[in-house]
């Protein structure tokens, strides 16, 4: 299994450094030479973890469902979709409600798209692409969404993503980029919640080490608020969630 580029600090040391974002920390899955078996195992086991951490049911109810109908299919874009467990979960909610939804999942990592494409369907399509590619193609979507992408980005990349999102959102649509909020409660909570599974359900995957690294790389609400252009807003949610929202129906905090 691949080793981290920077060793994961001990718990007390990590908690002591969370006042500042660690932009030098690197996730194991971002290594082009990462073990492919461990990658697949990670994608396979993301589902149960993401249902708790990323709350796709709440995303569906607040942002997606209001834009769906029975008469025509709405379009949703998932940016940096990874293995595609979250968009497929959202699609299941729409199908349960008898509402029409088509999802395009994009990721620049061929390994992620290869895994996500195993679950392709008429309403779920994964492709290797960036938001800039879709802007160039003239694509638009009713919902443009990402999960746990923001903490991977440099300031310039964040600005480009938000600018592309504004171009990709169709009239009346919404752009939502969700991520973790960095903090001691988030770090300690994930550390403790995943510890009992480190040697069984999560063994051989990158979920636990990369999850902890993600928190160290993530922003606080005030950091994101200072980094976003006019028209975007930061919303806080549970558990330790942040959402950057753009569109005509931004709810008040």
Residue ranges and their predicted role:
Residues 1-44:
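N-terminal, positively charged/glycine-rich alpha-helical extensions of SAM-dependent methyltransferases
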Residues 32, 36-62, 67:
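Class I SAM-dependent methyltransferase Rossmann-like catalytic core
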Residues 77, 83-86, 90-133:
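Class I SAM-dependent methyltransferase SAM/SAH-binding core
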Residues 145:
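A conserved beta-strand element that flanks and buttresses the S-adenosyl-L-methionine
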Residues 148-149:
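Short catalytic micro-motifs in class I SAM-dependent methyltransferases
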Residues 159-171:
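A short glycine-rich, Lys/Arg-flanked "PGG" loop and its adjoining helix->strand segment in the class I
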Residues 178-227:
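C-terminal alpha-helical "lid/dimerization" subdomain adjacent to the S-adenosyl-L-methionine
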Residues 217-253:
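Conserved Class I S-adenosyl-L-methionine
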